[in-house]
Amino acid sequence: MGELSGCTGGSRAGGPGPRLPLLLLLLLWPARASDAAPPPHVVFVLADDLGWNDLGFHGSVIRTPHLDALAAGGVVLDNYYVQPLCTPSRSQLLTGRYQIHMGLQHYLIMTCQPNCVPLDEKLLPQLLKDAGYATHMVGKWHLGMYRKECLPTRRGFDTYFGYLLGSEDYYTHEACAPIECLNGTRCALDLRDGEEPAKEYTDIYSTNIFTKRATTLIANHPPEKPLFLYLAFQSVHDPLQVPEEYMEPYDFIQDKHRRIYAGMVSLLDEAVGNVTKALKSRGLWNNTVLIFSTDNGGQTRSGGNNWPLRGRKGTLWEGGIRGAGFVASPLLKQKGVKSRELMHITDWLPTLVNLAGGSTHGTKPLDGFDVWETISEGSPSPRVELLLNIDPDFFDGLPCPGKNTTPEKNDSFPLEHSAFNTSIHAGIRYKNWKLLTGYPGCGYWFPPPSQSNISEVPSVDSPTKTLWLFDINRDPEERHDVSREHPHIVQNLLSRLQYYHEHSVPSYFPPLDPRCDPKGTGVWSPWM
């Protein structure tokens, strides 16, 4: 038989010659969408007021076996930052943007304030919904509710079950807040299923209610559709309440607040274990990314602890903003490791949207970075800097023990620091450096009540001091201010603070509106 027309090299019909290019073509042909790996399910568990020293994998005496096991098989985030209070952390989680860019840099959203995360911000659930996800939220909102347009079901969540305000009773599900015209406080129900009051859960502990709703959502979820579940537990925010049996293992803790708190953490740990079990039972776990994070540091006045870190909830010290967290997933390329790469709560939005195959188109400029390769593969973090906050109107709602007020603000500042007014409450991280200005909040160290007779170790800083520089890698406990040894670092970071300050929007902190009064309905609800 003669050679095939157009062939070279002596290849004959039926021989290997023509098949090799065909094989290469098939190998190089783009995979069909149906052949690609399906987008992962995402479960984001946010604990409330959980301290650095309140988890077993950080060396706490509190027993957290389920969280410890997930952390041990995943990636522990050891250089991860959140905000000092709940609204700031939650808003930055869902927008991927610093609070100075939304007018939320001052304190938090109060119950009767006509305020919420700006409605022109596109939130994480909206972006994931655009990517084909089912989006569900269970638990604490605290991002404003004065208008129905501010509610979770109007901001991208298919379903919502939880409470809208900052804290409430774990059993009655009532929240109390001041009503200015009454010169007193009003208490009312704050629990909703969708947008309707949920009145049938009295005397049922909130962590159990939220866990039941989360596991039901998982059990009923079609595995072929990607799931986003945002589970924002009430635990372990005050009031200090927990079923008695969860306190019994902690009889050795003499401090009553710490003992109740420990029981609350144990119940939270059990809840996360039940959620994980539900994911496995439904066959979702092998394609799930589970993220666990606190929203801010522990509140030492309510049993929490951040030892050996300095400070507590409400402060820019490490005890207020160093986030306890981890990522657990069979999809991780590295497991059982601790990441020292710099990360921030704003990073979750771009990370999860990109992981979902979605797009951040339509958002305002993001401050977060996609850190999935950092978490999953151990790559260097794309983040080298993060803004902690800038709040010219800061007041200390949680003063140091024995102190009743915020130290008086000194508006004069040395000329050598003229790049930024150092009397302003602000903070910034750059690589290993951390700069604080103004009054960062109570700078005491608080040893664990169960391990020491000393309730706090006061700072020796002058009350008029308004500038600190720390090498956090060498000094995570913030005991050695090195600002005098590194004036050029100070100047550079002050210049960065000034840049952020100039590009911030004015803080929006409207006065309380007495029309919020729930007297007529007995339920906290939108009023405008």
From Swiss-Prot:
Cofactor: binding comment: Binds 1 Ca(2+) ion per subunit.
Binding site for substrate: 140, 237, 313
Related illness: Defects in Arsb are the cause of mucopolysaccharidosis type VI (MPS-VI).
Activity regulation note: Inhibited by ethanol.
Active site per database record: 86, 142
Stretches of the chain forming a coiled coil according to its record: none
UniProt cross-references to SUPFAM superfamilies, sorted A to Z: Alkaline phosphatase-like
GO cellular component entries: cell surface; lysosome
Pfam families, A to Z: Sulfatase
Family stated for the protein in its record: Belongs to the sulfatase family.
PROSITE patterns: SULFATASE_1, SULFATASE_2
Catalysed reaction, written as an equation: Hydrolysis of the 4-sulfate groups of the N-acetyl-D-galactosamine 4-sulfate units of chondroitin sulfate and dermatan sulfate
Disulfide bonds: 112-516, 116-150, 176-187, 400-442
Protein name per the record: Arylsulfatase B
Phylogenetic placement of the source organism: Eukaryota, Metazoa, Chordata, Craniata, Vertebrata
Record: glycosylation sites: 183, 274, 286, 410, 421, 453
Cofactor: Ca(2+)
EC number: 3.1.6.12
Any single GO BP term: positive regulation of neuron projection development
